Amino acid sequence: MSYAAYKMMHWPTGVDHCAAGFVTHSPSDAAAFFTAATVGPGPEGDIDSAAAASRPRRLGPSPNLVVAAANVLEVYAVRAETAAEDGGGGTQPSSSSGAVLDGISGARLELVCYYRLHGNIESMTVLSDGAENRRATIALAFKDAKITCLEFDDAIHGLRTSSMHCFEGPEWQHLKRGRESFAWGPVIKADPLGRCGAALAYGLQMIILKAAQVGHSLVGEDEPTCALSSTAVCIESSYLIDLRALDMNHVKDFAFVHGYIEPVLVILHEQEPTWAGRILSKHHTCMISAFSISMTLKQHPVIWSAANLPHDAYQLLAVPPPISGVLVICANSIHYHSQSTSCSLDLNNFSSHPDGSPEISKSNFQVELDAAKATWLSNDIVMFSTKAGEMLLLTVVYDGRVVQRLDLMKSKASVLSSAVTSIGNSFFFLGSRLGDSLLVQFSYCASKSVLQDLTNERSADIEGDLPFSKRLKRIPSDVLQDVTSVEELSFQNIIAPNSLESAQKISYIVRDALINVGPLKDFSYGLRANADPNAMGNAKQSNYELVCCSGHGKNGSLSVLQQSIRPDLITEVELPSCRGIWTVYYKSYRGQMAEDNEYHAYLIISLENRTMVLETGDDLGEVTETVDYFVQASTIAAGNLFGRRRVIQVYGKGARVLDGSFMTQELNFTTHASESSSSEALGVACASIADPYVLLKMVDGSVQLLIGDYCTCTLSVNAPSIFISSSERIAACTLYRDRGPEPWLTKTRSDAWLSTGIAEAIDGNGTSSHDQSDIYCIICYESGKLEIFEVPSFRCVFSVENFISGEALLVDKFSQLIYEDSTKERYDCTKASLKKEAGDSIRIVELAMHRWSGQFSRPFLFGLLNDGTLLCYHAFSYEASESNVKRVPLSPQGSADHHNASDSRLRNLRFHRVSIDITSREDIPTLGRPRITTFNNVGGYEGLFLSGTRPAWVMVCRQRLRVHPQLCDGPIEAFTVLHNVNCSHGFIYVTSQGFLKICQLPSAYNYDSYWPVQKVPLHGTPHQVTYYAEQSLYPLIVSVPVVRPLNQVLSSMADQESVHHMDNDVTSTDALHKTYTVDEFEVRILELEKPGGHWETKSTIPMQLFENALTVRIVTLHNTTTKENETLLAIGTAYVLGEDVAARGRVLLFSFTKSENSQNLVTEVYSKESKGAVSAVASLQGHLLIASGPKITLNKWTGAELTAVAFYDAPLHVVSLNIVKNFVLFGDIHKSIYFLSWKEQGSQLSLLAKDFGSLDCFATEFLIDGSTLSLVASDSDKNVQIFYYAPKMVESWKGQKLLSRAEFHVGAHITKFLRLQMLPTQGLSSEKTNRFALLFGNLDGGIGCIAPIDELTFRRLQSLQRKLVDAVPHVCGLNPRSFRQFHSNGKGHRPGPDNIIDFELLCSYEMLSLDEQLDVAQQIGTTRSQILSNFSDISLGTSFL
């Protein structure tokens, strides 16, 4: 293997940074949402009244939430659901049954846009000037000194780069002052009034970013086509301040403070650095200095300063007005400073103050604030999220602008947070790398009536490991009240000046959660609970799942990940030659039952030449002979009409309308409705149903419309004249129903009264109006043109010329913009030649348009091409100014009514393309059966199912598409939903092998994630996991922090000499009554129960006090006594007793009990103490390889003893061991990797070669490509290197040195590689491959793979990769080649070969338009189909789960 491909399969989920701001709208836009709903506050005495609880007293304009996870940037909108006043009966039960707080019954995060960047986000802020009609700008900082500003562009419904600032390269080399390595990347902060921003780069270089004057904006002004209702803050220029020239040598933090005419920057710096071991001589070494920034004069005089701050000060918090000033956060104290006053608060007994200081107030409880995250809930209350997961409230008690004191109170518990931000005045967000990130609503004065209802539920902390894995996945309404209780916060012994009372009354409700599976320390590969032992081929991979060690401390969990869905099977029957299935409802009258809970009445099965009908009652019973359905031929489509009172069955030559089982009308189709009855019947190719209309596409390409009459429940046939006179052939068509009393598409009309964000609820009682304008017909012609018509008038309201090309933006051609015309001209010159290759071959075969539930939801448009490509578009509304619209004359067939055509068109309707990871690359016949089936409730989820050779679920969660393939049954011919007594919100599908299966989605999994995930709370930190296949057990190392009395801890160390060297004051009587937190380790053996998917701890192996389990592995050893192989559980441990005690550890071996009735699942068969920490174990040809300290020993097993037979001295500390045949690969913590071989004849471990460089290894593994063996290592600088052993090459120093085959910067710490055999693809002749890819997990929660590829594929894709660097505009202006270069972090390194393909960059090729794809492929000398075939082969070959 000379070449490899790097591919991310599950993107990072651990939140590093978060911020809130009005990015997609201005405060004045958002205020329009709440003007009608917001009621003014009542008098003071009315706070506890029942009426005050149900009305929104504090809900104001809600800003956006911006979240960064490694290189993933996401922008969310907070969607709050207000409770109906006076119990209004029209509200949906799901939206008001949640706990009501401040008039809000529920809230959720809805995705606006997201991007995967070519660089990790080091810091983030939102630049806002506070103006009512101005939007905020997102400022991102990247290594080493790159800053990018992004603002939201309504024209594309996404972020656009407004400015870039780079201080790298030769001209800025002097800024580093000779240094090559920096502990932190740039840190960026914003002025509260948006006048400027500041970024600290290279440790001591302050970059000042000057904001432009009001009205200057890239999006708002420079683009003539964009007319925004509000412009965003924009950076005009930047300049540098050298802090070294200001006598600063060690800057810790900085912040802009409030209340000054000019921006004032306060910098926390250390004059003379010290550390904890020298605090007796140097303790108060920090100080703060406030600089007034004059950007015009580029001057920055010091206006005030404060010295003698503790050395452990690490963070500044600017206090909001009217107080102003700054809080200095230290590990053991909090200090407030302003230009005129100061005060402090001691947090524990470790805090100290300079001599002569006034008396300092102390906190009522002991706490440490190092590594705490903070955000302001109001102008005088700041919330801290501590390193232990506690939430603390600090109240700044003030009189006027004079701060009198600081009061700290305990609040609830929360997740271990990595970032915190307030969102408006009702929410805050806890971002976490170690647990699920939470959206929390808070309220100061919740009424007693509300709190009584909430406190009756079980009490719980605000933690991410409550049952969120199953519940927090859909619209968080009624499910949230079960997992979070809200109770009034009460604090004892607190005096109540200013807002102290409100701090006491703060109540919380967790409203939503973002699932996080990071950090992935280790994972194992095992069988699922519902695995099929008879599965063959690629479908067999759906039997497996990843069981991962996630989280830390109380947020620790076992994350069970599945790349594909394997449904829970209820029943299965053989049904050959099935062509389609449908379920229909039947109502004899309009009942009060909600539509979502109504059971299906009939199952219609279309066979090759007949139709079966089954009743879906308690049992599926065939009623084909007793119903009036047309059963003598196959059915084309079936569905409900007239409010589910009738069933429509469409077959080849006609259609029937049925009332239950009785036919009420039969229609026969002819070529045209106007022709005589003697006309020859015309066959129906496909049909689309949208009550009360049925659209028919005939075999000859014509279109007919069946129009329903609600009064008589009958249909009439209409052939639209616009298509009769048209010469264009129709390739695909569908109907779209714009549901609700406020149809979404109607708001995009040019003559509609538009108000940003009309917030009426969607009608949920089934009585929505049947306005004809709610139904639209979408037609795509063979030429590629797409048109949207009103039904039944068939007046064209939207038209796009080249839909099948997959442009990034779809705009009505009647109101095309100037810049789009100019863009199109770039490709006109190449279209003629390129169209010869693909223009005639690429066709649309199926269309679908659907708007799923949700008050703010928008329609999705899907187009399936005949090569398997699924085009996905999301609709949005954009109102362009009249002066920027270029009128384009319509074609004669473009509209039936030219009079007033401009006013009737959906001129404000646009679609932006959404990336969707569908790997199917199959040739789909033009007249094949439908592949797309939409669903509104399958297991509580909504979306669509894509049948075919590579079936996939496309679930709509938070207005985001989540793609989950279903490969367990091979190709799927037909799919439909089923809801009855025995199958609640399930589904039915028919496989290509002729089996009909009734299934449900596994309820234990959360599908609102990159992969379906189940999180099993451990309430401890998981470290390592392994899999015992014979009994499907998962041994797992878990550590739990335990608080013990200090005297008990010391007594356990009595046999160690360290206890005699302790100072007398440490072992005094008072000190011995203190407590000490120690981590207690144990090995839990977990089993996945077959029914329900619940995990149970079958056995626990406790470790001794101060004994840390470092490794657990299943090993197969050859018993030299019995001459048999034994499968044992091997555990390696280390005693952690401080630096003064010699390291030692133990090796433990356990056997598994075969009997099911045995009380002891495992039995200890061997235990021996080692002189060093046992960090890794592995089995090598029946021997046990043990890494103990700086030595590797190979041992043979006699059944009772381990006997050493060979050893090798490692440099420092072994972090990983890998075995292939008789070869050994191990990674050292500082000295890179070593390649050994085991020779049984001479009983020796001999060194073959090693890497002579310095490398801090994280993980190692072998990469196998046929007969070629490569060695892979990940390091502490987030790189991956591939080495190979070539003793015959001169560069290898006679075979002593491992040579570099490839190197690559991943951007994350990879902690585990797992070698898995690649799957065969259609291009390979043999059924089995001898290629093995490496599946890896990283600390950011990402999962990916490194796969070997052949040279021809590599050359082709490398050429494409180099072309895409220039051909694709990259978000934030980041260079992908620069990001993927090896990062040596200042160490000497010789660049290696560039032999890895970056699929993160290559995936942007599929998002190019068809013309651009053909153009790029032609320029690199290949074809589009060949490139997409290579993509598909690699995706199929790495579908391990």
From Swiss-Prot:
The keyword RNA-binding applies. GO terms for cellular component: nucleus. Keywords: mRNA processing, Nucleus, RNA-binding. One of its GO terms (molecular function) is RNA binding. Its main location: nucleus. InterPro entries: Beta-prop_RSE1/DDB1/CPSF1_1st, Cleavage/polyA-sp_fac_asu_C, RSE1/DDB1/CFT1/CPSF1, WD40/YVTN_repeat-like_dom_sf. It holds the Pfam family Beta-prop_RSE1_1st. CPSF plays a key role in pre-mRNA 3'-end formation, recognizing the AAUAAA signal sequence and interacting with poly(A)polymerase and other factors to bring about cleavage and poly(A) addition. This subunit is involved in the RNA recognition step of the polyadenylation reaction. CPSF is a heterotetramer composed of four distinct subunits 160, 100, 70 and 30 kDa. Belongs to the CPSF1 family. This is Probable cleavage and polyadenylation specificity factor subunit 1. It comes from Oryza sativa subsp. japonica (Rice).
